[in-house]
């Protein structure tokens, strides 16, 4: 076809795309987007181990001590290879754990600050146990998938709680990690009224971090912190003992055998999700029989919800399978049914941060 001489030519980069062109481009972009997303999901272990080693190697503490430092200096401080550490720092910068670049050096971001040793809001112990023992257990996910049993037990030859009892250093890390993952504890006494309580029994309360927050806000009640003997032995220098020693009794024991008597409030914070329904009913039965007339039960757990968005509860539901075998997260209806079978009625459900909920229950009439 002959083009008239006076016709205006359209530059190639100004050509208007037709509908088929746009459809073709969208089809080409979709696999790239999906492929990138799949790679990011598949390589999640890159992030886990990078963050774990940033804490475990002393890198984060070295950066904190220097304020800002280049890779070579940080390699000298941590006894690592300068090139390898430089690569790790670049990756951590992409994850928003550190900021900066060489030669000016790297500093910690707010995320990186959470990996420091000994700071008030530190999540270092959380990262340490997830990046080591739990990481190895997840490597045996196929065992849990085939058998429905704990991959942790398969890898370490012992269930988690027996293993912690046999390894005091890890037990201490675990209990500190459990506190590090609970920034919502301070809000519990804000959303639930403990002022009328006379005796609060915290069942399997660890080092007493939740009980500490409750007693700080409510000066009237006395309390019992009840947990395994090796856990109770670790609480001597914790705030629950040092700040509330005259109000708190530390009691070692096994909640499958019984719980301390006479409480009018029994706390179960992130305990029931560790066990199957049968074991939960045993724990709840002991709480019911020990409870003073008119007593109540306070349960803190993540609740499963339906939806396609990101959900910590869905991830922890898998984590309970891998690490504990019989453990599981449950939805509100499942907890209501469980409580009713144990002789309680669910009175209220209150939302807390990190997809956690406080469920208050009383004895059924």
UniProtKB/Swiss-Prot annotation:
Catalytic activity, EC: 2.1.1.380
Output the PROSITE patterns linked to this UniProt entry.
SAM_OMT_II (PS51683)
Region described as Disordered: spans on this chain? 1-32
> One Pfam family of this protein, by short name?
Methyltransf_2
Task: Cite the annotated pathway.
Answer: Antibiotic biosynthesis
Q: Which GO molecular function entries does the Swiss-Prot or TrEMBL record give?
A: O-methyltransferase activity; protein dimerization activity
Q: Which GO terms describe its biological process?
A: antibiotic biosynthetic process; methylation
Keyword list, A-Z = Antibiotic biosynthesis, Methyltransferase, S-adenosyl-L-methionine, Transferase
Report the catalytic activity: 3-amino-2,4-dihydroxybenzoate + S-adenosyl-L-methionine = 3-amino-2-hydroxy-4-methoxybenzoate + S-adenosyl-L-homocysteine + H(+)
Q: Which domain of life is it from?
A: Bacteria
Broad class of enzyme this protein falls into: transferase
Which positions bind S-adenosyl-L-methionine?
Answer: 227, 253-255, 270
Q: Which residues form the active site?
A: 273 (proton acceptor)
Ranges annotated as biased composition (Polar residues): 1-18
Task: Provide the family line.
Answer: Belongs to the class I-like SAM-binding methyltransferase superfamily. Cation-independent O-methyltransferase family.
According to its UniProt entry, the function of this protein is described as: Part of a gene cluster involved in the biosynthesis of cremeomycin, a light-sensitive o-diazoquinone with antibacterial and antiproliferative effects. Catalyzes the methylation of the C4 hydroxyl group of 3-amino-2,4-dihydroxybenzoate (3,2,4-ADHBA) to form 3-amino-2-hydroxy-4-methoxybenzoate (3,2,4-AHMBA). In vitro, can also catalyze the methylation of 3-amino-4-hydroxybenzoate (3,4-AHBA).
Q: What protein am I looking at? A: 3-amino-4-hydroxybenzoate 4-O-methyltransferase
Native species: Streptomyces cremeus
């Amino acid at each position: 076809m002959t083009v008239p001489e006076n016709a205006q030519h359209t530059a190639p980069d100004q050509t208007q795309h037709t509908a088929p062109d746009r459809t073709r481009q969208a089809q080409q972009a979709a696999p790239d987007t999906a492929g990138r997303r799949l790679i990011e999901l598949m390589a999640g272990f890159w992030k886990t181990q990078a963050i774990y080693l940033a804490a475990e190697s002393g890198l984060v503490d070295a950066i904190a001590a220097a304020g800002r430092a280049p890779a070579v200096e940080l390699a000298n401080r941590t006894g690592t290879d300068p090139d390898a550490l430089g690569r790790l720092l670049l990756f951590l910068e992409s994850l928003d754990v550190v900021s900066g670049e060489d030669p000016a050096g790297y500093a910690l971001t707010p995320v990186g600050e959470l990996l420091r040793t000994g700071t008030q809001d530190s999540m270092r112990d959380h990262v340490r146990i997830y990046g080591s023992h739990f990481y190895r257990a997840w490597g045996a996910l196929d065992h849990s998938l085939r058998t429905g049993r704990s991959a942790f037990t398969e890898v370490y030859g012992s269930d988690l709680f027996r293993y912690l009892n046999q390894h005091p250093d890890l037990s201490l890390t675990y209990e500190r990690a459990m506190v590090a993952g609970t920034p919502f504890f301070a809000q519990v006494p804000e959303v639930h009224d403990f002022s009328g309580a006379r005796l609060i029994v915290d069942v399997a309360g660890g080092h007493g971090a939740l009980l500490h927050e409750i007693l700080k806000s409510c000066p009237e009640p006395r309390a019992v912190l009840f947990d395994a003997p090796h856990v109770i032995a670790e609480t001597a220098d914790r705030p629950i003992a040092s700040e509330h020693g005259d109000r708190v009794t530390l009691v070692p024991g096994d909640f499958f055998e019984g719980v301390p008597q006479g409480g009018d409030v029994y706390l179960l914070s992130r305990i029931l999700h560790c066990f199957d329904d049968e074991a939960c009913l045993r724990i709840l039965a002991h709480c019911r029989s020990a409870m003073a007339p008119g007593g109540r039960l306070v349960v803190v757990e993540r609740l499963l919800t339906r939806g396609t968005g990101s959900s910590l509860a869905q991830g922890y539901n898998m984590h309970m399978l891998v690490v504990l075998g019989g453990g599981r997260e449950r939805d509100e209806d499942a907890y209501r049914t469980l409580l009713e079978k144990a002789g309680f009625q669910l009175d209220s459900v209150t939302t807390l941060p990190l997809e956690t909920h406080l469920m208050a229950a009383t004895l059924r009439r």
